[in-house]
Amino acid sequence: MRTATKLLLLSLIIVFTACQKEIDYATSNNSGGTGGTGGTNNTSNIEGDYDFVNMAAHTESSVTVDASGIQVKAVTVSDYVTRSNTGTMKITADQLISTNLGYSIDTIINVKTYMDNVLFDDSDVPFTGTTPPSSSTSTYVRNSADSITVTGAIGVADPSGVTPTGPVGVKLSWSGDTLLLKINSNFTQSVSQGGVPGTMVGSVNGTLRLKKH
């Protein structure tokens, strides 16, 4: 029973972490995010051409399923900075246009497993993944000099194949010639793995870095 349950949870974690790897999500309930703290540099005009530098994220999620009458919950925490980053982004007055954006992730996920609210296992699980280069166009509206709301994927299409929805709040700041897009987003969605239904609740604190040409 212990081995079978652990294998089920590991398969759930792998699938759901793939969904987490994006800053934007297809979810049943997305709070829209609050963004970061922003900066003091002038972000009133961000139009231009950029290279994708990387994306850093802290993710937390809780997946709960009912396995043969036992409530099983996996709580995962991960931190990563993307590698092998490729692609460009063009920002217009109301669009984010990405071309051939891609990256890889190589990190460790901490997983705490609970059975009927009793800690069953605490493990560090290696996770690697690659998002092949892809192109997309997202729209945005300006909220203030350092804040926008984006609808659609921010740069990279969701590797799970699900169409992102949004909207997501984004705070803007500069670090030299690099534009920082900061997102704090909470989400809830129904999930299924191997025919077992469940609920996933999570949050992402991420920063997308774009270097201006």
Mark where each language-model region is.
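A generic short-segment signal for beta-strand/edge and adjacent turn/coil regions
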Residues: 17, 57-59, 67-68
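Contiguous, well-ordered beta-strand patches that form the walls/edges
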Residues: 55-62, 79-184, 189-194, 204-213
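Generic intrinsically disordered, low-complexity segments enriched for polar/acidic and small residues
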Residues: 12-13, 22, 47, 100, ...
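Acidic, glycine-anchored loop motifs typical of Ca2+
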Residues: 65-76
